Amino acid sequence: MAYFPPPLKQIKDGVNPSNITCSERLELVLKQSNGEPACLKPSSVSILIERGWAIHVLPDYTTENNNSEIFPSGQYEIETKRVSYFDESQGFLAKPSTAGNFPAVVMIHELWGLNENIEEMAEKLASHGYIVLAVDLYKNQVGTTSEEARQLVTAFDSKVGVENMNSAVSYLKTEYSVESIGSIGWCFGGGQSLNLAINNSDLDATVMYYGQVSSDSEKLSNISWPLLGIFAEKDQGITVSSVKQFELQLNDLGITNEIIIYPGVDHAFANPSGDRYAPEESQDAWQKTVSFFNNNLK
């Protein structure tokens, strides 16, 4: 079995966090508390990620591709603007340019922050007849390297994050008098989408892409609306077994849900910035997402 130096030693030797090599049968994660890398058994990784003690490591971000290019636009022309909705945070709002009573969606970014790709996804969803507020959980900071993302997510305060997202919900209800509202997020944002559902009773639909799941029935019991979960078979952090347990808890609580596990793909398969990107599965997942929102918010 090949031996590799401890992760911290590799970083001191100048290795990028996303390029750290773990010994066989171990997986690389970052400790949520201090951002330090660690090589752990996959069984431990899934537990730590579920409990919020660890996060995935992704390759550096690239703008060579973006998801919005592979999805057809909806029937509406859109308009966009920056809005102040919480403390120092400015969100990106996209909405149909025509008058009408549209449902709303809170969109939550990946661990990179509110970047151009998330803004483009907000525009794409808005074109299907939604008022979309893409929140900023990092106070106007965006990461493009794994090291920058590590620093941002390590500094993230989950309690403040809940306040931030709840403020986004309140903003949409106050400013646009929306009658129905949902949430969606990817990766870090997928876990936050579920976290918002657990900590807000004013939603009507929740979508999460390969985000941190929960098996805590007491927390999940707050959800009284449909949930769509998109996951990856090869994800060693959000494992198939943990997703199945999550689905079981939802069913036991009588929460309407659709859990989809795409075979042969890995965590962040809908992220165009890395080699895990799977365009066909991403497109299928997005079509299911739009249909889910159409069925539950309109």
Q: What function would you assign to each model-found segment?
A:
Residues Y176-W186:
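Alpha/beta-hydrolase fold nucleophile elbow
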Residues I70-K173, S273:
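Serine-hydrolase catalytic machinery in alpha/beta-hydrolase-like enzymes
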Residues I223, G229-F231:
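Short beta-strand/loop motif that positions the catalytic acidic residue
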Residues K234-I238:
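Acidic catalytic loop of the alpha/beta-hydrolase fold
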Residues G185-G189, S193:
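Gly/Ala-rich beta-loop-alpha elbow adjacent to hydrolase catalytic centers
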Residues N251-K298:
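C-terminal catalytic histidine-bearing segment of alpha/beta-hydrolase fold enzymes
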Residues D202-Q212:
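A conserved short beta-strand
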